[in-house]
């Protein structure tokens, strides 16, 4: 019986086809890579074209410059919430929002003309410049302060008590889809420093005190907290 030879490179090592690479990255052996979809590096600040209430929740239309590059069914994070592209028309993408999505995120607060932070899902080979972000919003929180300090901005956000154990000083947190570092941590709030570039290319340039932002806490912290909780029961 003739055996099938496997392709190899100049070092005599077998090469792996791209589809095999995808299988490896999405295998149960790599749960972190399987769930990793975004990094919190905003690709574009889109603009809300419309938010239409429907029986199942709402239809969100967002103007974007990369509509010609997205396919139906593709995942795009909107203010940090992973949504599915369900239609593309006239330079805008449509996303269907369930009532649960409207309840758990700030997407229902949006109005036509509002900026939205957009990030397409990762492809194998992309640089991981931020931190592991799933696009699963854990909570909404109120902006307590957004003040210019020199060229930067000091950004303070309320910290819901039930999630306080997931935030650490100098740790990563995703705020409205942006990967940021906790600069100061208090019992009921945390503070971030925003550099000029981040201020200019994200929705933070329109940030107002009292408005809500989406929070996604560090994935590893959530898993550790869950393991600790179960070990005590």
Located regions from the model:
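Basic polycationic patches enriched in arginine
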Residues: 6, 20-22, 123
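Conserved loop->alpha-helix
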Residues: 32-233
